[in-house]
Amino acid sequence: MPRRRVVAKRKILPDPKFQDRLVTKFVNDLMRKGKKSIAEGVCYGAFALIEERAKEDPLKTFKKALDNVKPVLEVKSRRVGGATYQVPVEVRQDRRVALGMRWIITYSKARGEKTMQEKLAGEIMDAANNRGNAVKKREDTHKMAEANKAFAHYRW
């Protein structure tokens, strides 16, 4: 454990278009090599595609997708007397959001559409409808936690 003081979390300002902190976090996760304007273009372009295709508010669709992807439980490795157990633990709220966003971005990159905007829009719409690889990842994570429920007493 570090002995220094705990570093304060940085304040995240709402994004200019939707006035929402979650969108800012998402743009920051999407950003590569500090190119924020490109990440914003991809994100807002994907939101425009969602609005065009689904005929509904892209922000609501995004939040619904994120809620469908956020994991409640995950497993952590714990070494006990030479054996390593996968111990199910509850996920903190801020980590839930971070994992959900990360999974949406990761699995949208692996999709077959041509541009990143189309890939991202497709994955967000699939996740909002409880389909897609990001939702499957959450289900797999929950299955792992359920399968290892016997080791829950090793929690720390």
Curated annotation (Swiss-Prot):
SUPFAM superfamilies hit by this protein: Ribosomal protein S7 (SSF47973)
Recorded family membership: Belongs to the universal ribosomal protein uS7 family.
Subunit structure: Part of the 30S ribosomal subunit. Contacts proteins S9 and S11.
Pfam entry (one): Ribosomal_S7
InterPro entries for this protein: Ribosomal_uS7, Ribosomal_uS7_bac/org-type, Ribosomal_uS7_CS, Ribosomal_uS7_dom, Ribosomal_uS7_dom_sf
GO molecular function, one term: tRNA binding
PANTHER family: RIBOSOMAL PROTEIN S7
Lineage: Bacteria, Pseudomonadati, Myxococcota, Myxococcia, Myxococcales
GO biological process, one term: translation
Annotated protein name in UniProt: Small ribosomal subunit protein uS7
Record flagged with keyword Isomerase: no
Family matches, as Gene3D superfamilies: Ribosomal protein S7 domain (1.10.455.10)
Keywords attached to this entry: Ribonucleoprotein, Ribosomal protein, RNA-binding, rRNA-binding, tRNA-binding
Entry keyword annotation includes RNA-binding: yes
UniProt function note: One of the primary rRNA binding proteins, it binds directly to 16S rRNA where it nucleates assembly of the head domain of the 30S subunit. Is located at the subunit interface close to the decoding center, probably blocks exit of the E-site tRNA.
Taxonomic source organism: Myxococcus xanthus (strain DK1622)
GO CC annotation: small ribosomal subunit
